[in-house]
């Protein structure tokens, strides 16, 4: 019998992050999203091409702050570099602050729509924009582009829709098999799917690229894609 993983319960209602989720989040997300760690590894490697001695970095939807800690360690010899983690969920920020031992990382409980950015060399968004209402996404991407320095990078990782319903059904089934193989029960998968209706709204690859282009990005590449998750690199 498969070992049951630690659970984040999702009832058949709108998805929310409760106050206890932060402690389980990293374990859960690694079990839920294919190539989660691998995409973070790619992001670390790519960061070398954007970060300088006095760079500013933003992680939008930083959750528990784990990735920013990895990034801060990688660039520990850049003494003036500053990292900012933003998340709308207070319990995530509180947890991130408790486990952080880097003086150059600041965690902020703030909605990106109301946040005032400084000019930065790198902005990161792992699986965050997909939770923002579609009518607000273009303004968010415009804001990101505006506050990047020339030559700055935007690491944009999202769940994506397929171009046609048949392929979407295939990939959804494959993704559900992935979660079952990682210890989730069918009931958990169904409840999670229902709870995310109207909350998680993925765009297609083309729609995400159009968002980036309309905001001003010209150099846009798909760095990696697995099932229905994709890593975009956009450079100003």
Residue ranges: model-predicted function:
Residues 124:
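A conserved beta-strand element that flanks and buttresses the S-adenosyl-L-methionine
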